[in-house]
Amino acid sequence: MYGRDPWGGPLEINTADSATDDDRSRNLNDLDRAALSRPLDETQQSWLLGPTEQKKKKYVDLGCIIVSRKIFVWTVGTLVAAALLAGFITLIVKTVPRHHPKTPPPDNYTIALHKALKFFNAQKSGKLPKHNNVSWRGNSGLQDGKGETGSFYKDLVGGYYDAGDAIKFNFPMAYAMTMLSWSVIEYSAKYEAAGELTHVKELIKWGTDYFLKTFNSTADSIDDLVSQVGSGNTDDGNTDPNDHYCWMRPEDMDYKRPVTTCNGGCSDLAAEMAAALASASIVFKDNKEYSKKLVHGAKVVYQFGRTRRGRYSAGTAESSKFYNSSMYWDEFIWGGAWMYYATGNVTYLNLITQPTMAKHAGAFWGGPYYGVFSWDNKLAGAQLLLSRLRLFLSPGYPYEEILRTFHNQTSIVMCSYLPIFNKFNRTNGGLIELNHGAPQPLQYSVNAAFLATLYSDYLDAADTPGWYCGPNFYSTSVLRDFARSQIDYILGKNPRKMSYVVGFGTKYPRHVHHRGASIPKNKVKYNCKGGWKWRDSKKPNPNTIEGAMVAGPDKRDGYRDVRMNYNYTEPTLAGNAGLVAALVALSGEEEATGKIDKNTIFSAVPPLFPTPPPPPAPWKP
């Protein structure tokens, strides 16, 4: 039978397909019956066989928790496997040889730094700590100040002996402590890398603890302060036992040690002592109580110096003979700069940036000694210290004009150090003659080396590649080359092929003008004149005063290693302080231990932008 497909094709009724559909339907019905019968069979079986027993899970009771035994075994196994793996790795790490990169040997500047700091241990007065590390030194000067009847100063134990004698001159001692503090503030990372940070801070504190005894540091104002302990007067044939007539170990001193005070013109001494205390307060800023004590003392003594105008050395013959101060205006700027950094009080900045202050200090004079930084003249150091403020904080009006002047003058000083300009003569061996051929030149050259290196680091930190000398531009590397040339000369790169730092290298001075180093520690007490035989002996000193930088050669690079010729062989606190500062500034460059610390010195300085105005009063209708 045929029909027609409505889409155009034939439409057949296929009987075969129809039959197949019937068969398929019957098969499906059979499957359904089979599916229904299977659970019935299982049910019947359960009646006959009984219920199937379920397999019980096993657990482990750990006391605080119950866990599956399977999980417990898996966890323990994992931990054991991890422990075995860790042990295996540890065994490999410990047994397999490791190849460490070799630590570069310390450079000469770092080696010399260790020794130069040790000199201060040898110069300590008072009851020495057990770790002083100078075997031939002992307690000394324990009666200092105690014999002064009617005096406020009953305890002046401590501090440092100035040079080869046992006098404590507070003016150069304060300068030495300021230099040590300045070097720590700028280069604490280098001290830390050299393992000397704790040591140098202990040396500074030894000095500042003593300074706090030299005036009434707990008062709000003072009328005098100590300038000197001990005497060296041998004028007019004076034979009274004192620190210059006698030649004795400091430990054996039995003569009177007079105390000299200053109650008239003390501006230079007071301002320098303020600089020492203020700079040290930054070094010890983490010790809040001690730092606060130092700041208070610095304020009191600086104000005293401003009130009692005059040179401290004008009133005493000994001070004018040994450490004569040429003026006090440079100390006013130097001390005032440190007071500003230590306190953040803008009053100090206003004071030291007055043009008249700079004029009195000789900032515009020039002259043959302009740029010579020393225990006497602090102007070059003060100008660099204030150039730092302009470079990194740029305080602007009203300080910019005078700070720019200080900065320009600092650049001129740096130009004067370069050999191309012939401002200062040099020996044939290359030593700069900042004191124009006078004796004891090394103390001035190390100071110049420090200032040059520090200015170079300031410029580098300010992303400034150099500076101008007239129309010519010079890289900061030129300053470091100058500094290295001076320190290398002192360490042995000179015509005599000898080191002027005792204990550095194999050839160095053996007849140092120093009482303690020249007399053996042999349980024999040599009296005032009994020690003369050691003073006049031609034999080398029995004790090595390690790290002492002697006065130095003459203008012809000549050197006489004669104990009694102090112009060649005597070391000083001020000289060694400059040496330490220059050495740490140049040290560690191969190990990349960092350069200056830009921020620590500004810890107490507040923001220099104007205070914003107060908010307006609340609006009311």
Curated annotation (Swiss-Prot):
Role: Required for cellulose microfibril formation. Involved in cell wall assembly during cell elongation and cell plate maturation in cytokinesis. Required for secondary cell wall formation in the developing xylem. May cycle through different intracellular compartments, including plasma membrane.
Keyword field contains Cell membrane: yes
Assigned EC number: 3.2.1.4
Recorded topology in the membrane: Single-pass type II membrane protein
Effect of residue 59 to A: Abolishes polarized targeting to cell plate
Catalytic activity: Endohydrolysis of (1->4)-beta-D-glucosidic linkages in cellulose, lichenin and cereal beta-D-glucans
Species of the source: Arabidopsis thaliana
Family that this chain belongs to: Belongs to the glycosyl hydrolase 9 (cellulase E) family.
Glycosylated sites: 108, 133, 216, 324, 345, 408, 425, 567
GO annotation, cellular component aspect: cell plate; early endosome; endosome; Golgi apparatus; plasma membrane; trans-Golgi network
TM annotation in the entry: 71-91
UniProt-annotated stretches for the region Polarized targeting signal 1 (PTS1): 48-49
Region ranges (Polarized targeting signal 2 (PTS2)): 59-62
Keywords assigned by UniProt, alphabetized: Carbohydrate metabolism, Cell membrane, Cell wall biogenesis/degradation, Cellulose degradation, Glycoprotein, Glycosidase, Hydrolase, Membrane, Polysaccharide degradation, Signal-anchor, Transmembrane, Transmembrane helix
SUPFAM superfamilies membership: Six-hairpin glycosidases
Protein name as annotated: Endoglucanase 25
Result after altering residue 250 to L: In irx2-1; decrease in cellulose production
GO molecular function: cellulase activity
Tissue specificity of this protein: Highly expressed in roots and stems, at intermediate levels in leaves and flowers, and at lower levels in siliques. Expressed in xylem (at protein level).
Extracellular side: 92-621
Region of interest (Disordered), residue spans: 1-26
Active site: 165, 513, 561, 570
